[in-house]
From Swiss-Prot:
<dbReference type="InterPro" id="IPR046341">
    <property type="entry name" value="SET_dom_sf"/>
</dbReference>
<keyword id="KW-0539">Nucleus</keyword>
<dbReference type="InterPro" id="IPR012677">
    <property type="entry name" value="Nucleotide-bd_a/b_plait_sf"/>
</dbReference>
<comment type="function">
    <text>Histone methyltransferase that specifically methylates 'Lys-4' of histone H3, when part of the SET1 histone methyltransferase (HMT) complex, but not if the neighboring 'Lys-9' residue is already methylated. H3 'Lys-4' methylation represents a specific tag for epigenetic transcriptional activation.</text>
</comment>
<feature type="domain" description="RRM">
    <location>
        <begin position="111"/>
        <end position="199"/>
    </location>
</feature>
<keyword id="KW-0808">Transferase</keyword>
<dbReference type="GO" id="GO:0032259">
    <property type="term" value="P:methylation"/>
</dbReference>
<keyword id="KW-0949">S-adenosyl-L-methionine</keyword>
<feature type="region of interest" description="Disordered">
    <location>
        <begin position="226"/>
        <end position="478"/>
    </location>
</feature>
<dbReference type="GO" id="GO:0140999">
    <property type="term" value="F:histone H3K4 trimethyltransferase activity"/>
</dbReference>
<feature type="region of interest" description="Disordered">
    <location>
        <begin position="662"/>
        <end position="696"/>
    </location>
</feature>
<feature type="binding site">
    <location>
        <position position="1933"/>
    </location>
    <ligand>
        <name>S-adenosyl-L-methionine</name>
    </ligand>
</feature>
<feature type="region of interest" description="Disordered">
    <location>
        <begin position="1"/>
        <end position="46"/>
    </location>
</feature>
<feature type="compositionally biased region" description="Basic residues">
    <location>
        <begin position="1628"/>
        <end position="1638"/>
    </location>
</feature>
<dbReference type="InterPro" id="IPR000504">
    <property type="entry name" value="RRM_dom"/>
</dbReference>
<dbReference type="GO" id="GO:0005634">
    <property type="term" value="C:nucleus"/>
</dbReference>
<feature type="compositionally biased region" description="Polar residues">
    <location>
        <begin position="535"/>
        <end position="551"/>
    </location>
</feature>
Amino acid sequence: MSFKEAKPGERGKNPEDHGRKQTASWINGMEAGNQPSTSGEKKSHHWRSYKLIIDPALRKGQHKLYRYDGLSFSMPNSGVPPVDSVRDPRIGRIWTKTKELDLPVPKLKIDEFYVGPVPPKQVTFAKLNDNIRENFLGDMCKKYGEVEEVEILYNPKNKKHLGIAKVIFASVKGARDAVKHLHNTSVMGNIIHVELDTKGETRMRFYDLLVNGFYTPQTLPVGSDLDASPTVNETPQVVESVKRTKETAIGPSVTPNSSTPFSHDTAYSSSRQGTPNSYSQFTPQSQGTPHTPRLGTPFSQDSSYSSRQTTPAFHYGQDSGFKPRRHENKFTDAYNRRPGHHYVHSSGSYRGTEHTFNVTRPQPEPVQVPRTPPLSHSSGNYKSAFSPYQGNTVFPQTDESQYPQTSRDMEYRRTGPQTSDSYSDAGCNSASLELKPVKEKPEEPPPPEPDSTTEQKASFSQTPERCETPGTPTLEAELQHNSLDTRIAMLLKEQRTQLHLIAGDQNSDNEIRMEGSPISSSSSQLSPIPPYSSGSRYQDVTPSSRPSSTGLEDISPTPLPDSDDDDEPIPGTASLCQNSRSASPIDQINQSGRKTESLDKKELVAGDETPTSEKMDEGHPSSGEDMEISDDEVTPSPITSAECAITSSSVISSVIPIPPPGFPPLPPPPPPQPGFPMPPPLPPPPPPTHPSVTVPPPPLPAPPGVPPHHILHHPPPYHHFPVMQGEMMNVLGNHWGGMTMSFQMQTQMLSRMMQGQGSYPYHHFMGGSMQFGNQHPYRPFAISAHLTRGQPWPPFPKFDPSVPPPGYEHKKEDPHKATVDGVLQVIVKELKAIMKRDLNRKMVEVVAFRAFDEWWDKKERLAKQSLTPVKSGESKEEDKQKTKEHITSSLLESWNKGEGLGFEGIGLGIGLRGAIRLPSFKVKRKEPPDAALAGDQKRIRPSHSVDDEDEESERDRDISSTASDLSKKDADAVNNRRRPARPLDSEGEEEVESEGDDGETSDKEDSSSEKEDQDDGSVSALSSKKQLYGDKEGDDEDDDTQSSGKEEDLVSEEEDTTSVASSRAEMDSSDESEESSEYESSSDSDEKEEEDDEEEELVFGDDQSEDQDLGQEYEVETDREEDFFRENLSECSSLPKAGDVELEDEMQKVEEDVARQTTQETLHLRKKNLDVPLVESKECKQDTLDKVEKLFAVPMQEEVFKEHEKAPSPMNEEEEYIELQLEPVPLVPEGAAPAAQEPVIIRPLTPTGAFGETGPVLKLEEPKLQVNLTQFATEDEELYPRTPGRDTAAHSDTEVTFQPGLKVAPSSLPFLPSHNKEEECLLPPEKHAGHLTVTKMLSEEDLPRTPGRDIVVKSSHLGKSQSTETVPATPGSDAPLTGSSLTLTSPHIPGSPFSYLSQSPGIINSGIPRTPGRDFNFTPTFPESNSIFPCHPSGKKPSVDEPDEKSFKEPTSASLTMNSVPSPIPFASPPRGLPHMDIRLGADDLESSDTPAYLSDKLLSEESECEFTKVHLTSTDESAPSPPLPPAEKRKGDRSKKPLSAHEFETEKNYETSSAVAMSEGALGKQMFIGQPDAVSGIKDPAAVPLDFRNDSLSENTVHEPIIQKVPLKELENQWNEVLKEEEDITKHKKSRNSRHNNRYDEFSTVPSPEFSPPRAMFKPRSEFEEMTILYDIWNGGIDDEDIKYMCITYDRLLQQDNGMDWLNDTLWVYHPSTSVYSPKKKKRDDGLREHVTGCARSEGYYKIDKKDKLKYLINNRSLTEELPIDTQGKSIPAQPQASTRAGSERRSEQRRLLSSFTGSCDSDLLKFNQLKFRKKKLRFCKSHIHDWGLFAMEPIIADEMVIEYVGQNIRQVIADMREKRYEDEGIGSSYMFRVDHDTIIDATKCGNFARFINHSCNPNCYAKVITVESQKKIVIYSKQYINVNEEITYDYKFPIEDVKIPCLCGAENCRGTLN
């Protein structure tokens, strides 16, 4: 805007009025003559806005023509039509919530090109003591102000101190103070000479004199004048005085301005200082309340330009407004002194504009400020743009309240317009703007005429910051304008490209100033001032000051009368807005937008109309702050909707500057935020009709005629991002506490928060601060807003309100942004690739070593197994498991412990899954292949880290995992077989042992589970793993682990679990061990489930645990279940080892009894849902169940093994195990039952096979095995994966009473993975009660869960509801679980195709033995009752739809004869056949089936819990009917041979899960479908199909059963126990996961989702902050694949929803690689390693590492390494990994010692050398406490092991002597020469290895030995003793005694004191 020089009075008036209510006279732009400047006139007119339509400065000979409020004209017959519809041209919504953009203002370089008075900030020191250095001098000067540069001059020839120095202060005040206080003072004995040396001329003169030798530093002639006072040009002094006034006004507050080098000098200096307003970013500029005086504003002292540049538009406004305010006071004199200074003041007024608006704030010189209202164009205006424009809008009064905001806006504007000199209007504007000290309420803009001088004075006083040039008259400013504009434009261009923040501030200023340039056209005086003098500083120079020069700015929030108006032809307001320096409309709009935004915010902050001056001061400082505060404040501020709308429109239009030619059009401004009235979309601003704004501000990319929006001031919208960053950081820092967030994260979160607030329609960035205010939460907040506010270049067509925020929203981005981004992307990608490569390499190495060790261990174990299958296998398995556990533990430890589980720890985007996955690069997945080999199973497990196993096993669990699980289970079985040697005396003991083996198995299982779980949720998997590992290590550990992972759940559940555990303990030690696992799992599980599980646990603790675990994580559950099942099996097997036959008999009896009772009680219980106390049924049934379970465990295991045998790897292992497990499977008490299941699995699951060995039908000792399966299934199942038998027993809901007559082939009853509660619900309790009870009891128990145990566990989840309760009573399923009853008619599934072998004892399914899960035919064994019963999770009705759940999808090759609902497990055998027939079990098998049915109940209940989790897995195995297994006996043999491998068990579990899933309507179907893959892939005999779906039960079961048959029952029991324990561990882990997932599972189970969704853990609802923290943590830690996956899923789901999320429609999902790369980089950073500029240390070359940094990472690394072992020890999991490593190392060392003992000493050394070379010790060098660097062990080293070879150059003595001298000359004090013998010396000085770092110690832990290898002598360092991790490697140098002693620093007790 151009203004005639307004009279100071006018100006003061106008700005204040402008700042106040623009209803006051906003006549600053009017000539005094045209409109009286009197307040009366103001009152009469109540103009809210004005526009300078004609500016004589632009049109010669014409009078200034102002249009007020779009209707009135300053001249009666203007000939210009009034505006049709008067409204605020500014798009207010854009500015509603402006956040301060902290745009670092580039510092103006004071050089020959500098235009205007140079700010006297440079001080020259002379006669300094030559000891004074930069630091000293800088410290000496800092007390007087911020020091930007300190330079001491030296003689270039001799580098001697010349005694002269240059100190550049950030502020003139600081420089003056320094001169004042330091001149002629004594410093270091010298009286120093200090003077202001603005251009350094004096210093250069001194320098020349000194360098030329004319004087010495002490004789240097320093003029008295120099001494007396710093030489400052008058102009600089004037500027300085002006500055001082500014500074004094601002001075009190420490602001970047004062501290900033240019703060006082000019807007440029402060804004250009590059120091963003300290307060500008998001903090209010006032650094406190938005109303804080500008003094507090960072740039308040500086000019608005600086503030503006530093800050977003508001910042400008704030600083300018603030400063000008203060400056108004101080500069009033200066300004009055020089009319030209009006312009300068206008610049200041830019800030002054804020002051003007601050007129709202109490300010003595609001009148002066009003001059700045013209500045309203400038940043001040911008800031107040909203309300001013709103004021301009038809809302005079309404806007008045807003106008206080406008006042702020005016301040901003004022800042620009204040250069009234520049504007011909300035005078008028000032007069008009002369807002009378109505400071807070310049309701009516004074007529343009009013005190323009005053206003100018105000502007000037405001501008004094810019008044670096204050002395320069406006003309001078004009003269400087071109050069300054050009220069500023160049600077701004640079800044645009370089600093978005700067651009933001500059943009406002530049825009204003650039607009000012046109405005300066309007007022040539102002115009000359560089448009970029955004701040008041360069008022003369800056167009911005020109805008500020007008009272106009103050008068009108949108300085209509700006030069823009003049630029524009009179005819059209729009065209005027466009053409005239868009600044007036646009600038006004923009500035108004800014001002309004800032004002809104300020007002909101300060109150609608705090005294304008105060408010403006505060407002501007708070402009950014206000913008931020205004987020909250905007709503509070009484902005009338009309105002808001108008403001929005005007602001938006203003905000949406027309992109300058050559710049891409600005994107449309973001829609106004909801909640704020949006002004009607302003018609798109017509292109600037005339670049009347003849002076296109060079910085302004916008067309010269179109002044860019203030906010748009800089073409680079990017500025807003930086501003956002700063603001976001500030805001977030405030809001989010100390949470470390990356800028992006802060920005995103702040944006989200802002969006959520939606308090103001104006975008923050539009406001010139952050774009977080974007209207739409998901709208890119920064781009358009940045563009709008940050880019001056897209000037709005004057104030075409039509320009919507969208255009404003997206401003031109930095032209180099794409390039920079591309380069950054490339670099980031490369760095990530490098990091990934390094990580992968490291991981591969680690994995390779580990795999090798494991392979070695496995081989050893296999060898030992062949010798001593039980012991060696066990120990090795344990070792492997431990190793794996360690790995997993270490991986999981931090996460599971909950230490790293926080958002920070996990990285929010990464999650536990990501965390675990990262360490375990799938490289470790060698198990599946190994799993294929029975012998390799162990190896497989070790080879896979738990994480890897979990990750991939879970993924591949159905198929590859099945094999691996089988192999794991085989290994476990081997361990279990070995385990029998150990009595399961104590729960912990057994569990620990089982856990050891199961640990491996669990690892495998976990790996498979985890893979699945990763799909479901790696968190659960992790917790499962952790729990699993904990279980392995011990129940206590497991409890700890789980408790850490799920302490809450444990707390609530522990009691239940404890009771369960106690009852379980009573029942059996195995139960106890299971109990502990279960306890943990239970704790993890929901209490309700826990209670059910407790009851179940009382009967079947393991099953309960499994069920719970399944509930948490079906994948992990499956693994755990396998482990748990193995453990139970082992326990059961081992406990009743002796009485296997008896147990079998008992089992048969129990089966019959249970079948009967189960049928009755199950119905009863299902009705009751846990009516029957579990304890009773458990206690009574436990023994029976144990027997049954063992009986069934063997058959089931056999079946499972057969199924697994079908799987390649499991078969082999099983076969290996077969011999071991040939022993009869002893029935295990309740706890043993699950274990028995595995043995059962060992035996063929065929009806006869399952009970082939056992013989007797499974019978529960208690006639009634009453287990409330449904409830347990629902709760416990979800929470606890159940052991097949235990689940059955545990399911109180379905009291499983095995009727003596009832026989169920173990395979008949698939251990269905139960949907957490879905399946349970599926089967009506009534229906389930009778048939399902028997079925469940028999099926679950009969069905061995080891392979099928997963099924059992899953089935138990399902099983509770599925088997007896939940499972629809398929004819066979509902039928009492007689042998046939066990046909796994998916009990949960109504008429599930697979029914238990035969619901009635008499029915036999063609005698085909079946795998517990697979054997189940989908066709109802008996259509009678079970077939009809759909399995519904409690409350769910069976629906065919449910089948969409994968397991239920389709019973493979199973006819869904039962109900339309496919049975959970498709059976190969005909669906309808006797259960025996289906399972192919003889009577014995049926009996076993009964036991498995019993187990199956548990499993079902477990499965019910896991239903969702495992549905898919289970359905895979279950749904696929397995081909008939070999006869029961054969399978028994096989199973005996081979204990259920983890995979088998997992497969069974999966199968069970599938069954359970199938049973659940949809969930069952879906899970069945999922599970079916195994079955489908190879449907084997039901027996052949392992219940464990992880392993392809098909092959593995087939193979395993024979193996199992061969395996002694003891081994089977051991295996089973191991499996059970493993499952238990898994269960625990799953439980912990399930506790989280169970709730979701329950939900899912209850409402099976059409699509199978992984179980979700239930967490306490996160706060919005937490959500956002997680959401935006991707900015900190990147986003991992998992998060991307889920984000994509969420995106897809959201797209399918009609939530009005329009942004989604505009969002296109584009694949992007994960950005979450866990790399050592962070650790290194943490360790103190510096960040490399290039991003890669390798590219940095050699550089010196600071000792401090070294100490940091030395200490940190050492402490970390030391702590890690401690943590590891403290945590069983970590300890185990270490132990496993240690164990391997010890074994190796033992082997070496053995070998060495066999061979001679020489050979021994050589052997040790080779072996150690083969197995390199992990060492590292770090700072040593002994001397400099030292070598430290990173792993425990056993005594007499080779640590490292001393490597170096092999040289002769002569060379060594020469080198020693040379080294001494070179300053290499350390000696790295090691004498090998008399002739040879190894010199490691220049080349060598880490051995060179080994320090001497008088009490060393190593010794050096010379050995000969291949005729070469080598120095090898051997360990003398056991060396712990992080212990320094030392040896005795054994230097010869010499006269010159070398002190010894070893610090040993027996230290000799010297090395020699």
